[in-house]
Amino acid sequence: MKTIAVLGSTGSIGTNTLDVVRRNRHLYEVYSLVAGQNIELLTGQILEFRPKLAVVASAAVLDLLTASLQAAGLPKSEWPDLLSGDAARVAAVRAPEVDTVISAIVGVAGLEATYEAVCLGKRVGLANKEVLVSGGSLVMEAVRKFGAELLPVDSEHNGAHQCLRAGNRAQVSRLILTASGGPFRNTPVSELPFVTPGQALNHPTWKMGNRITIDCATLMNKGFEVIEACWLFDFAPRDVGVVIHPQSTVHAMIEYSDGSVLAQISATDMRMPIQYALTYPDRADAPVPKIDWAEARKWEFLPPDLEKFPLLKLAYQCQESGGSATCILNAADEIAVEAFLQGRIGFLSIHEIVQETLSRMPSRTPASVGDILEIDRESRTLARELANCRAAGTVTA
């Protein structure tokens, strides 16, 4: 029986994780649930899975959760311990009973708790890209030092992990990640300045949170995945390729030195990579449709347009640069995406704000989680100023 902490239990990955647990009660027990402020959903999760600990974002949200549990009629003796704030997220993974952590909190808010789990030598199913994009060097050093298992949950890296099991890592020449191309794959460049947040949120394949959906529209998300792959699998950026695959059925490919290519192919259902991270090195039946190989189908593979989607190119450059560049990249992108979703800036201004933030922020090498969080904070402050200037129609010097 594995005991699990779910960081981000009310998000897409969190709810899918709990669905895997629901179908495999004999294998998994939920020890702690960490959420933001979706009280209705968290209350339902507490009633169903009976965790020992539940954590929310703030004291105000904690009061709402307390009232919700009272209204649900759950006897006080059956309540989990209720906590709030950053330190509580760390406590959720620190408990000795927890052996597996699913890291699915969006943004750097999940970094400290994930790093703590790694330092405690636990298995971490990583769905939070920002952990490695912002703190890859620090986190991977801790993985090696403390013997933690870091298993990717997102479909592309999970697919790469499966393919890499089939051969000798020293004989691998290249990793290839696939991308759907997003909603603007066929949109002329001349129309991109006028696209709306509603159009950008219309992802052709996956249902996800707003920020990651916009990042898919700009291909920034694929850039983050390139950075993440470099850290997870020890690849140089030049050895990680990206191809547009609109059907989103092939998730990743590994090219070996003899020219052979292994691909991981599956239905587009996040429960598969989540379950893989929980059951590895074993496999279990999954409640997802299998591919019918007798059915006629067409798969396309196309090169990405780096002029049309410059944030993907910028991600490669930041990973090559090292230091704090990828941390700045992530922070600035989050602020720019937020401004776009609010209708304050145009779609193309996302890249402009990220690029300008990178050019203005000094490069340094973070030596601790505190350093990473400080760089993130400074980058957000600058990016927000730049976004405000664009929203006001002024030019920054």
Swiss-Prot record:
Mn(2+) binds at D154, E156, E225. Its EC number is 1.1.1.267. It catalyses: 2-C-methyl-D-erythritol 4-phosphate + NADP(+) = 1-deoxy-D-xylulose 5-phosphate + NADPH + H(+). Pathway: Isoprenoid biosynthesis; isopentenyl diphosphate biosynthesis via DXP pathway; isopentenyl diphosphate from 1-deoxy-D-xylulose 5-phosphate: step 1/6. It comes from the Bacteria. Belongs to the DXR family. This is 1-deoxy-D-xylulose 5-phosphate reductoisomerase. It comes from Solibacter usitatus (strain Ellin6076). The lineage of its organism: Bacteria, Pseudomonadati, Acidobacteriota, Terriglobia, Bryobacterales.
